[in-house]
Amino acid sequence: MKKTLVSMLTLAVLLGSLSLNAQTTDIKPPKNSILSGQQQIMNEKAPSPLPPIDESNVMWKKTVIREIDFRQKINQVFYYPINPTEDWRNLITVIYDGINSGDITPYRVENNIDDMVTPLTRDDFEKENVKVGDPPVIWNEELGTEVPNEIAFKDRMLNVTRLRIKEDWYFDKKMSQFLVRIIALGPIVVDDDGGLSQVCWIPYEPSRPVLAKAFAFNRNNSAQRRTYDEVLQKRIFDSYIIKEENVYDRYINSYAFNIDALYESERIKNEMFDFEQSLWEY
């Protein structure tokens, strides 16, 4: 009789434990927003295809480099949030995550040229962009080898407050349109001494699948979600030209200073606008 009672009690305890485990397994994580499922939808999204360019139809082209300052209100979507959340990551975090996953390949900033020539591995990228004064590598006791100093690297990446965009403006005579095509992105770090340093070049076209799956914060309506690719393609930012292609290969700040540099930037922009208008007859 006692054995039967003990067996029944043991069975009851086991059944209760299984029931509790089943209930625990069935518990779903709470939603942080009514739009919490939007990121999963975005993970399947591909960037909008760009029209192919027939080089024989390009009758005019100018390459310019412009700079986006994240301190401007309209451009703050590129800098915030500093700490990633379920739905939002700032642009440099999106780029770094893409480099970590192998979906984005950074290129070294070469001396005196703005072309992408030398690709960087993730380790090389981190070593070359640690905070000034910190060692690029540290000793890892577990691995028994030197590894990139990720703490110093991430500390420096917090100071990415500008973005350079290299782009080609061109006139397609077949389509009769004045168009622009982004070539590369260049994050800019403000160092402790106030100097500006470009950390790398990111080729835009191969990076679009990553940028098209990351939301940029919409301060006016968080239900209308835009990706970083859409923000860049739709030109939802403010910027100023810092260089146009020229025979001396000079940046504006090498021959114009302070207010004169702004005037020169506006002159280049107006010159491009006037060229487009001069193509039409009214």
Task: Report each predicted region and the residues it spans.
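KE-rich/KEKE low-complexity, intrinsically disordered/coiled-coil-prone tracts
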Residues: 190-193, 201, 212-214
